[in-house]
Amino acid sequence: MEKRIKIAGYQPQGSILSQSLNIFSKALANDTSNIKTEFTFNIMDNGKAPEEIIKLVSDGAYDVGYISSSYFAKKIPELYIFDIPFLIKSRQQAYNLIEGPYQDQISAEVSEKYNLTLLSIWDYGFRHFSNHEYPIKTLADCKGLLFRTLLNDLHLKMFASLGFKAEMM
């Protein structure tokens, strides 16, 4: 009997996140011949916001989805560790963190607070600033510059403290 797994994301098909979903799908296909995957690479194309993936997977509309840790951080504040600038000094330090007891703790909290199963925490790189006004070279360059960020209270406070006019997307 064939099993269908519906997978959702919030990036265009060519993004690194969507490419990762393809790799995940191929791994499933290699392990079992009776699993077929269906993708919705970008739920925003269907009028859904990225944070809705949590509810869509919880409610069974999708079986698998990826989401930024920022969207879970209100109920699991330990995830804010990924949003504090300069706290994690290297990629290796991040890997050591997410491959140990920390991931087990977060996994248990995701299960308890969201009724979801955490498959993994992955490295999504580092944040950079860009804008169409002027280069940011000093702290003064941040003053009043509009900056959009994820739905994350820590981001709003942090960017506002730097002088940005921060707003959530």
What is each of the regions a protein language model found here?
Residues K26, D63, S68-E167:
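Contiguous mixed-secondary-structure segments that line small-molecule binding/active-site clefts
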Residues P50-S68:
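Periplasmic binding protein-like
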Residues D31-T32, A61:
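Sec/Tat-exported extracytoplasmic proteins
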Residues T40-K55, Y134, L151-L154, E167-M169:
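Short helix-initiation/N-cap motifs at beta->coil->alpha
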Residues S33-K36, V57:
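A short glycine-centered flexible hinge/capping loop motif at secondary-structure junctions
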Residues M1-L17, L21-S25, I35-F41, K143-R148:
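Short, well-ordered beta-strand elements
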